[in-house]
Amino acid sequence: MNSLETFPDTIRCVDASWHLGNNRDAHKEFLEGHVPGATFFDIDDIADKTLPLPHMLPSEEVFSRRVSSMGINNDHTVVIYNTAGSFSAPRCWWTFRCFNHKKVHVLDGGLPAWVAEGGMLEVGEEKAVSTRPSAGLVQASGNAWKLKEKGFKSRLNPAMLRSWRQVLEQSTGEGGKGQIVDARSLGRFLAQVPEPRKGLAGGHIPSSLCVPFNHVLEEGNLAKFRTATEIRQVFEEAGVDVDSSLPLIATCGSGVTAAVLALALEVAGRDAERSPVYDGSWTEWGSRDDLPKVGS
């Protein structure tokens, strides 16, 4: 199909493109061409802005309100993509999963795969919310708005994420056995190359293992996920026990590519709740003098 307009009304498509440090404007690119009917999900905007860290998980209320305004409710199947293969879409997937929405999928290969398969592109702003079924917001009085009955209602699943305290406990063994896997490049992991964000120490969390996120993706422009067998091999070669019933915490620079590993582990057959993401990741850990580091 060339347009999501031809899909059942139960499906919503979301562009969750995000870029790090290369002066690209994801929303501008969305306006220049996106999957027809898609809405734009800004991970920096739909976030907890009370914290000094980037794109941290928003509150239930904020997520409910913003997702409802996109015309998405709890009955919808959400399909997420980004413009760079499989880079930031998994972060949006993980966010929906954090709020207990399980009918959420990532378009493998993203927008490049859509175009390669002959999919058409739509230019300009997304549809006005008022034209979308189940828009999710109704005006109560004056400037006050409230959730429509069919809007999105969030309920946080704490099993999907970890705080720095929980990571520290697992790193030292105080929180029980389990593993921590880092999605950054080996150079960053070993503090051989500087972090892209200023003010961060180099190195990695003690006892963590390095599995660069691109290793679970195919090479090339589409960057699709490898097969389940290949993904398992990548993790196992790094010393990761994919079949363990113990927690396997995914971390990275700021919680984006850690979600790539979390999704890859689900592709490999692991329950997502057993592969939580450390939301603050190295942006938080590497900025704190009171947290232990290896290689800095």
In which residue ranges do the predicted regions lie?
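Cytosolic catalytic domains that perform sulfur/thiol-centered chemistry
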Residues: M1-S296
